[in-house]
Design a protein with these regions (language model features):
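Intrinsic-disorder-associated, low-complexity terminal segments enriched in Asp/Asn/His/Tyr and depleted
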Residues: 4-8
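Short, positively charged and aromatic/hydrophobic N-terminal segments
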Residues: 10-13, 17-25
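Core alpha/beta nucleotide-donor-binding catalytic domains of modification enzymes
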Residues: 30-39, 43, 47-201, 212-226, ...
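Extracellular structured ligand-interaction cores
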Residues: 35-38, 64, 154, 270-272, ...
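Class I S-adenosyl-L-methionine
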Residues: 168-452
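Polybasic, glycine- and aromatic-enriched phosphate-binding surface used to engage nucleic acids
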Residues: 407-510, 515-522, 526-528
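TerminUS-proximal long segments
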Residues: 519-552
Length: 552
């Protein structure tokens, strides 16, 4: 008999949901069924799937099929699938994975586990959904996976169709393109591939994630989201299918709002489909639309909802990681040169601040102190940074430590800095110092008014880039981690001015709640992109608990 909450929730529970999880544990213990199959579309590196597959130590759900177009993100997805297969079916061989992570082996598998590596490649597929070949492969894989399960046993579809065209930033960019036509942008309609899978295979439940910009996006004067709701509620009608199929109720995870076939979407408060991640123990202000679709024969009254949690700050999440310095780009880099160049840059700013207006003048002694301390951090990190005493990685939250930390790792994965120009490093050091005093980032040219701080942008004083240099405030959840972090670090400046840098991939991954043993593959830019596009796994884990309870 299981009598420990950790047998259901393998990490210490979030403070506000202990009672809920205990009830859920009892419900799940009443069945001895096999793990519920999951099909994960547009999977990226696997954040949404990680949350589901880790529930109840991997016995509640099992990823049967995952699909990702990007070959580098697919490498990460496959590696994680391999880890799960080792964990669930051959735990005595987990050492193969850790030897690879710790830099003791070139490959994650040995001759004894190569079969699981190949199996992981069949589960995690690199295909383009929507293409003829991609759809044929996907359909064959889904059919094979679903045929293995006992008749009438449930299965779940998860995923988030690519969202660039929906995002507010993406739409602003498209407005600058005179030839852009929303109706011709295939990214608007990739959700119909998701819809096709719903219509063909009728999952008991689906979870669909997207940016909140989807709520206001329009094509030819019609709100896209209204059409999406109607399509998802009745996939057969949407796709003009001849056979009669199931309909779905589209449920909010944070309110009692439900959309059903025949309802008028204009009468809905669409914001009730937005999940604010920071309200649920995620150290990041990430606001996303997440739809829970429940097949009409599975629908029930009084559906469970996500439970609000205590806030987790940036410092909580990343403060326990090793301190690092940035790299000098476009010039020679060394510890001595970095200390000299950055120290001098901050000293110059300190002297200028001493004669500035009151808001900035206050910073002068703090900039002086930062300049004097700049040489105390002289490590730039590594893809595999050896663990040393003094950096425990702990967060101050037991449940988060049990979710993130892994004692089998001898290294910090993906924790390395990138290069920045010396003038940008001056801006980073200044902005982080400003934030340490005012608990906010400096805004625009009026608070970046010292010599050398203004970037060479013609419209710098227009107000368009008022938050171009944004510090992640240590005592607050971070701002949204996005794929833009792969381009530059200006929006993701570390709160410690002495480190004078942008966030590493591992720090961004922690703010997204990826476990420390989640090894992102590819070059650093590609790693950032994967992390920024993902669903926070710990949020997905809580959603998985809701789904498990509905299907229990």
């Amino acid at each position: 008999m299981v009598d420990d909450i950790h047998d259901y929730f393998p990490f210490a529970p979030l403070p506000g949901i202990l009672v809920t999880l205990l009830k859920l544990q009892k419900e799940l213990m009443s069945t001895t069924s096999l793990p519920i199959p999951i099909v994960d579309l547009f999977a990226g590196p696997g954040g949404l799937g990680e949350g589901f597959s880790s529930l109840k130590n991997g016995t509640a759900f099992q990823i049967a099929v995952s699909a990702e177009k990007d070959p580098i993100a697919h490498q990460t997805l496959r590696l994680r699938a391999f880890y799960r297969l080792l964990y669930s079916s051959r735990p005595s061989k987990l050492g193969d994975y850790y030897r690879f992570c710790n830099g003791q082996a070139e490959k994650p598998y040995s001759c004894e586990t190569e079969d699981l590596w190949h199996k992981a490649g069949k589960e995690a597929m690199c295909i383009e959904i929507g293409s003829v070949d991609g759809n044929a492969t996907l359909d064959a894989s889904i059919k094979a996976a679903l045929d293995k399960r006992p008749t009438e046993e449930p299965w779940v579809l998860i995923g988030g169709p690519p969202c660039q065209a929906y995002s507010l930033v993406g739409r602003a960019r498209n407005k600058g393109n005179a030839d852009y036509k929303a109706e011709d942008d295939h990214r608007h309609f990739l959700y119909r591939e998701y819809l096709r899978i719903i219509q063909n295979y009728q999952p008991d439940i689906f979870v669909m994630e997207n940016v909140k910009g989807i709520l206001s996006s329009t094509i030819n004067g019609k709100k896209i989201f209204h059409e999406i709701l109607k399509d998802l509620a009745n996939p057969n009608a949407a796709l003009s299918a001849e056979k009669k199929g199931q309909r779905y109720h589209i449920v909010s995870l944070v309110s009692d709002q439900v959309f059903s076939d025949g309802d008028d979407p204009s009468q809905l408060d669409l914001t009730k489909y937005i999940i604010r991640a920071e309200d649920f123990g995620i150290p990041q202000a990430r606001h996303r639309v997440i739809l829970l679709g429940i097949r009409e024969d599975r629908y029930q009254d009084k559906l469970p909802k996500l439970s609000c949690q205590n806030s987790v700050s940036v410092k909580d999440a990343i403060g326990g990681l090793p301190a690092l310095r940035s790299l000098l780009s476009k010039e020679r880099d060394s510890n001595a040169l970095w200390e000299e160049r950055v120290g001098k840059e901050l000293q110059t700013l300190a002297e200028a601040a001493s004669t500035s207006d009151d808001t900035v003048k206050i910073l002068a002694p703090y900039l002086q102190k930062t300049s004097a301390s700049i040489g105390c951090v002289l490590t730039t990190g590594s893809i595999r940074l050896p663990k040393k005493t003094g950096s425990s990685g702990q967060t101050g939250h037991d449940y988060l430590d049990k979710w993130l930390l892994d004692p089998h790792l001898n290294v910090w994965l993906n924790h390395e800095t990138r290069g920045h120009r010396i003038d940008d490093l001056g801006r980073y050091g200044y902005a982080a110092t400003f934030a340490s005093i005012y608990n906010r980032s400096p805004k625009g040219h009026k608070e970046f008014n010292l010599p050398r701080l203004a970037p060479a942008h013609k419209n710098w004083e227009s107000g368009k880039f008022s938050d171009r240099f944004r510090v992640q405030i240590k005592d607050n959840p971070s701002t949204t981690i996005t794929s833009h972090i792969s381009k530059d670090g200006h929006y993701f400046i570390h709160y410690d001015p002495v480190q004078c840098r942008s966030l590493t991939v591992r720090e961004a991954a922690r703010l997204q709640t990826f476990p420390d043993n989640y090894f992102f593959q590819g070059g650093r830019t590609q790693q950032y992109h994967q992390v920024g596009n993902a669903v926070p796994p710990l949020l997905a884990h809580q959603i998985a608990g809701i789904v498990a309870r509905i299907l229990a």
